[in-house]
Amino acid sequence: MSSGERVAKVVLVDIEGTTTSISFVHDVLFPYAKQNVEKFLRDFWKEDDIKHIVQDLQQVPKFADYKALLSAPPTEVDIELIAGFVRYLIDQDLKVTPMKTLQGLIWAQGYANGELKGHVYEDVPAAFEAWRAAGLRIAVYSSGSVAAQKLIFGHSLAGNLQPHLSAYFDTHVGHKQEQQSYENIAKQLKEDPKQILFLTDIPGEAAAACSAGLQAIILQRPGNAALADDQKASFELIPDFKPLHNLKLPINKSQA
């Protein structure tokens, strides 16, 4: 089925490499979190939500691995240790939920003080408007926390895009290359999986979504990873959202 013939009730979008450039995430957001994590922890170390995040970080299996790398590991958990561990996780690009939550809080400050603006490709706002005008719902599924997702779209270069979005999902619903995650999303959306179109740049995510019964299309944005021939043959590929501007709801046979 070509993009021009597709119908759906929900468009589920990934962020990095799909609505937003990979370079923004890796060259702007990640460095900002690394540069500001220690100061943020010093400012809010005694806050209950930060204490919970610190406790959760200590339960991450990689925490023991990180401490083993230190020449003189501290005998107690302190700000420097946690900040260093967060920087380590960012450098390893590990999708750890408490780290993602902490990143979201750090970014919130950056967006609030105007130091950050969320990048979205220029075709994204027009597509959101077209889909909403056609009666479709738009949801987001990203490894970044829901809070971070809302910041990108709420403080984007194109203005506040949150009014277009009806639901947000992060790794609390499951990891993005697992079939169960997409089954969980369909249940939470109260929607038949085959009526959900997932847009991503990662073949493994597209495959997991299809295994759960969703439709999936892969974005080939500038800077996205190259695809193998078998991956190109397995999925529909589009360069941007423009081929999907005419996406429509399925025909209700009772009204036809």
Curated annotation (Swiss-Prot):
InterPro entries: Enolase-ppase_E1, ENOPH1_eukaryotes, HAD-like_sf, HAD-SF_hydro_IA, HAD_sf
Gene3D superfamilies, alphabetized: 1.10.720.60, HAD superfamily/HAD-like (3.40.50.1000)
Record: residues binding Mg(2+): D14, E16, D201
Predominant place of localization: cytoplasm
Annotated disulfide bonds: none
Cellular component annotations (GO), alphabetically ordered: cytoplasm; nucleus
Record key words, sorted: Amino-acid biosynthesis, Cytoplasm, Hydrolase, Magnesium, Metal-binding, Methionine biosynthesis, Nucleus
Enzyme Commission identifier(s): 3.1.3.77
Reported cofactor(s): Mg(2+)
Gene Ontology MF term list: acireductone synthase activity; magnesium ion binding
Entry's localization field: Cytoplasm; Nucleus
Membrane recorded as keyword: no
Alphabetical GO biological process terms: L-methionine salvage from methylthioadenosine
Cofactor: binding details: Binds 1 Mg(2+) ion per subunit.
Superkingdom assignment: Eukaryota
Function: Bifunctional enzyme that catalyzes the enolization of 2,3-diketo-5-methylthiopentyl-1-phosphate (DK-MTP-1-P) into the intermediate 2-hydroxy-3-keto-5-methylthiopentenyl-1-phosphate (HK-MTPenyl-1-P), which is then dephosphorylated to form the acireductone 1,2-dihydroxy-3-keto-5-methylthiopentene (DHK-MTPene).
Family note: Belongs to the HAD-like hydrolase superfamily. MasA/MtnC family.
HAMAP family according to UniProt: Salvage_MtnC, Salvage_MtnC_euk
Name this polypeptide is given: Enolase-phosphatase E1
